Amino acid sequence: QLTRKKLKPIVGIGVGTPGLVNTREGVVVNAVNLEWQNLPLSQLLEKKYKLPVLVLNDSQAAAIGEFVYGGDHLPDENLIVVNVIHGIGAGILINGQLFQGDGGGAGEIGHVVVLENGELCRCGKRGCLETVASVRAVVKQMKMDSLDNVISVFQNGDSKAKSVVDRAGRYLGTSLANLVGT
C-alpha cells in the first residue's frame, strides 16, 4: 500500500523478528516461539518487494527505535529495552551503538536458566526465564486463556494472580539486575 501512495520514495524495509538473527545475512537462525530455523527472511522479502531488507532481532530494533525516536537520548548513552511478550528479550545499546555480541545473541535473556530443573522450555532447556516470567508463562500458570483475564483478576485482588505476577517479577527483576551488572 505504501509503495502505491508514493509519499516519499521507499528505500528499503526494516523487519524486527523475535529470536536469534544473523543480521549480516538476513537470516532468522532460530525463533523458537515461531518455529523458524535458518529462515532467509531478508532474501524472501527482497524477492517479493524488490527492495533491500534489513532483518534485526525485535528487541534490538525496539532499542534503536527508542534511542532515535523515544526521547532526548545522548549520543553516547547506554540503554536497554526489554520486551516481555511470548518470549523475553532485550535490546542493548552501549555508547549509543547497538551491541549484538558474537553471533547476534546479546540480549536473548529469555533463555537464561533461572530455575534449576524447572519447566521444559521451547528451546529445549529447563527453567528458562521465559518459562516463569513471559506473558505466555503467566497466562499458563493462571490456567487462563488471555493476559487480559489475568490482568482483570489481578486488579480485583486475586491472591493467586498476585503470587504468579510477583514470582514472574522477581525472576525478571533478578535477570535484569544481572544484565545491567555485566
Which residue ranges define each predicted feature?
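Phosphate-binding/catalytic loop of phosphoryl-transfer enzymes
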Residues: 9-124, 128
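ATP-binding/phosphotransfer module of carbohydrate and carboxylate kinases, centering on a glycine-rich
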Residues: 1-11, 24-25, 47-51, 70-75, ...
